[in-house]
Amino acid sequence: MSGERAKRFPLALEDLKRAPRKSEVRSGSGERHAASAVPKAADKPAAVLKPVAKTGAARALPGTAAAKPATAPKPTVLKPAMPKPAAPTIAPAGAFALTSERVRERMVERLRANGVTDARVLDAMAAVPRHMFVDPGLATQAYEDAALPIGHQQTISKPSVVARMIELAMAGRTLERVLEIGTGCGYQAAVLSHVARDVYSIERIKPLYERAKLNLRPLRVPNIRLHYGDGRVGLPSAAPFDAIVIAAAGLDVPQALLEQLAIGGRLVAPVGAQSGQHQVLTLVERVAPAQWRESRLDRVFFVPLKSGVI
């Protein structure tokens, strides 16, 4: 060891307290900046202690990156995204229009203007939600006076025809037991359930029979009994009936149905050719055990009355 270096060891106490050498200070400009910023931050404590919630927006310290989530998170929870108006706006409005009582009341007003006068029939038409018995794609037309397809080449009858047939069957009476031929989607049976104590309805097309059960289930109608079978045969086990309503047109009224009509009972049915050009709404009254009286009323158009089941 040279004499010059020997003089430097051991180091004195004052040599340990001296400023670091240039090689120790050069650790990067960022650290020098941070070191100089520390005393400045200590001089301004208000900028650090001011809470975000009081100001409503995050404030960044000078010389720092404002976008870093660790120091200034964006208050996303305070600004929830608005719901997209595309799907929800149209559906609820349409559903409200269909289920509102005002829409059904307007339909009832049209029925009254067309000559339906029995208040019980009008109340029954107002009580049953027709849109629940048609396909969703046709729901906007549910309260128009129009027959609508329900599949299997069958239709749901016009509201005016349903009201007219039920009013003819009632004739101001209180009905005890009613037979419907051709359940279809179940709409007319639902209306009949409001004016009769017991409603029996027969459907020969199995898918429609199942569909009617599904349509009626939400309404919780306790006095409807659905049957899968041949409507032309009727339902002898439940006869006699105060009224029989046939929702399909035949060339004549089956004798089996006439026999199941009670004395004083009324049967309402479309009668005529399958083309529909000569179909007439017909009223048959049983005036004696072997005597029936027939009246021909309005021109109508119905699907054909067929035998058997499918």
Swiss-Prot record:
One of its GO terms (biological process) is protein repair. The active site is at S157. Residues 1-46, 60-79 are annotated as: Disordered. It catalyses: [protein]-L-isoaspartate + S-adenosyl-L-methionine = [protein]-L-isoaspartate alpha-methyl ester + S-adenosyl-L-homocysteine. Coiled coil: none annotated. The keyword Ion transport does not apply. Its EC number is 2.1.1.77. Pfam families: PCMT (PF01135). One of its GO terms (cellular component) is cytoplasm. Keywords: Cytoplasm, Methyltransferase, S-adenosyl-L-methionine, Transferase. Disulfide bonds: none annotated. GO terms for molecular function: protein-L-isoaspartate (D-aspartate) O-methyltransferase activity. It comes from the Bacteria. It is an enzyme of class 2 (transferase). Residues 14-34 have a biased composition (Basic and acidic residues). Its main location: cytoplasm. Belongs to the methyltransferase superfamily. L-isoaspartyl/D-aspartyl protein methyltransferase family. Catalyzes the methyl esterification of L-isoaspartyl residues in peptides and proteins that result from spontaneous decomposition of normal L-aspartyl and L-asparaginyl residues. It plays a role in the repair and/or degradation of damaged proteins. HAMAP family: PIMT. This is Protein-L-isoaspartate O-methyltransferase.
